[in-house]
Amino acid sequence: MKVIKFVYKRLLVRLYLIFLIGFVTTILIAEITAPKIPILGFHSIINSANPEDKIFKNQKIQVMNYPREEIEKFLDYLLLRNFWFLTAQDFYDYFIQSKPLPAEYIGRKSIMLSFDDGYKTIQTNLLPILEKLEKKHQRKIKVVLFINSGNLDKIENKSSIHLTCNDLREGLQKGFYDIQSHGLLHKKLTEIKTPDLIAELKNSQLELRRCTQDLDPNNQVAVHLAYPFGASNSKVEKYASQYYLSGYLYNGLIMKLGRLSNNYQIPRLTINRKHFPNRLINMAEKSYKLEKQDKG
């Protein structure tokens, strides 16, 4: 009898282990094969040949400066491969709200290119590249700018490190910029009092809309938010939802369709100068070709 019980227990253990291994394997395969959309998060785009053209001069964070010649190679590749450059509203409409995909995007890979903090080098170094590549490929690249409206420079001068309202208007009018919010003054939203949190969220939206109101007939400016420092919690999300349709993190993760349970926790890949064009291309190629109906 004891032998039978021992054999029975061993059999149960084996069956349990087989089930557990099968379950874990299934989860891993599902994670690996899940459809992905890369959402890349840049900051400053610099001219490496110009020693003055460095937003981040502190050695520890200089890595956030990305060379313009390298991003040009990457963007050129994306155009050659016919990528769809998503705006924040595109992502919300088609991958959160599950609106039917326009025929022109079916069968193409998609990517979102975002730039935080509103540095002047977006206008001086990135915009000319976007214009140059449009002439070359006869296709326009859309980039998402997450802007701290309180840090916008009021007047144009040589020492400016941030964009002006006129810069935003120019890029928007030319069809290159998708302008969204990054808070008012780049405060860590998880560490401030409720009135300050509301002010950060509300006033940033108001100022960006005031700047662009006559150029935004569809009210798509400042309807999405990227959290400063990528910092968020349930309280921040609660108040963000009163002003914005979605919220973006900065957590180094790729967006997996079918895995997004909260549209105020959209993941972004953190990009710095250590990500050479080939590495960015590898990230981009993880995007899958879109089908008629996909959902985050």
Regions found by a protein language model. Give the residues of each.
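Short loop/turn segments at strand-loop or loop-helix junctions that form parts
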Residues: L40-I46, I147-G150, S181-L185
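A general structural detector for well-ordered alpha-helical segments in enzyme core domains, enriched
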Residues: F74, N125-L133, L163-G171, E200, ...
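Structural detector of well-ordered beta-strand residues that form the stable sheet scaffold
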Residues: V144-F146, Q180, A226, Y248
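Residue-level marker for buried hydrophobic side chains located in beta-strands
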Residues: L113-S114, I179
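C-terminal active-site subregion of NodB/CE4 polysaccharide deacetylases
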Residues: K2-F23, I27-L113, K120-T121, T190-G296
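Acidic (Asp/Glu)-rich catalytic clusters
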Residues: P128-K140, S160-S181, S241-Q242, K256-S261
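Surface-exposed cleft-lining segments at the edges of enzyme active sites
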Residues: G150-K158, H186-K193
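Active-site-adjacent structural elements in enzyme catalytic domains
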Residues: L101, I106-R108, G118-T124, P128-K132, ...
